[in-house]
From Swiss-Prot:
GO terms for cellular component: cytosol. Keywords: Cell cycle, Cell division, GTP-binding, Magnesium, Metal-binding, Nucleotide-binding, Septation. This is Probable GTP-binding protein EngB. It comes from the Bacteria. The keyword Transmembrane helix does not apply. Necessary for normal cell division and for the maintenance of normal septation. NCBIfam families: GTPase_YsxC (TIGR03598). Pfam families: MMR_HSR1. It comes from Colwellia psychrerythraea (strain 34H / ATCC BAA-681). Belongs to the TRAFAC class TrmE-Era-EngA-EngB-Septin-like GTPase superfamily. EngB GTPase family.
């Protein structure tokens, strides 16, 4: 069977879910986008899909509290996960959506690639590293997208990319690092190619877990 040809420009919003129980069936292939609340995740999604209003951009970091699903082809989805690391959010709310993030990462079998977005000026903070380490341990390919690279000179941008590559090389995992700018479209073509390659894999059938398999202990822990 030939693989599905993917065009990110065909992405269409389908649902916002508070947890994985309300997501589409765990089949096909998903690529998830995760990052700190001010990493420019929504802007990156809009740029990659050439749709200015696909992902809502909030001026208040920490507003994205749901798992947002965008379908790019039949059984091929982009997943916008809740942002993490923003302090000015009520603790109860923070725990609720960080639990949703952790459950998704641990339980979603159709997840085949993870895009971790980091401000190029402040990459690899503790939660970023935790997320990338988890992906490496799970044999999940990662695209480390260093956003807002238009804020740096070409020389500084290159040195930051090299520094991140060096820091992640010890994980011996499938991790690619790319400078990215939603404003200047820097890195758009390269990121598009990587994400589409993930989505164009052959999908496998999975045995869905029973409802009792989900427990409250599965949580992506937020630092205080």
């Amino acid at each position: 069977m030939s693989s599905t040809k993917i065009h990110l420009t065909k992405a269409a919003f389908t649902i916002s879910a508070p947890d994985i129980r309300r997501l589409p069936a765990d089949s096909g292939i998903e690529v998830a986008f995760a990052g700190r609340s001010n990493a420019g995740k929504s802007s990156a999604l809009n740029t990659l899909t050439n749709q200015r209003g696909l992902a809502r951009i909030s001026k208040t970091p920490g507003r994205t509290q749901l798992i947002n699903v965008f379908e790019v082809a039949e059984n091929r989805r982009l997943i916008d996960l809740p942002g993490y690391g923003f302090a000015q959010v009520p603790l109860a709310m923070k725990k609720k959506w960080q639990k949703a993030l952790g459950e998704y990462l641990e339980k979603r079998q159709c997840l085949k690639g993870l895009v971790v977005l980091m401000d190029i000026r402040h990459p690899l903070k503790d939660l970023d590293m935790d997320l990338i380490q988890w992906a490496a341990d799970s044999d999940l390919p990662v695209l480390a997208l260093l956003t807002k690279c238009d804020k740096l000179s070409q020389g500084k941008r290159s040195s930051e990319v090299l520094a991140v590559k060096k820091a992640l090389s010890s994980l011996n995992a499938d991790i690619q690092v790319q400078a990215f700018s939603s404003l200047k479209y820097t890195g758009k073509e390269q990121a598009d190619a990587i994400i589409c390659q993930w989505l164009e894999q052959e999908a496998q059938e999975y045995e869905l877990p029973e409802e009792d398999d989900f427990d409250d202990s599965d949580e992506f822990t937020e630092e205080e």
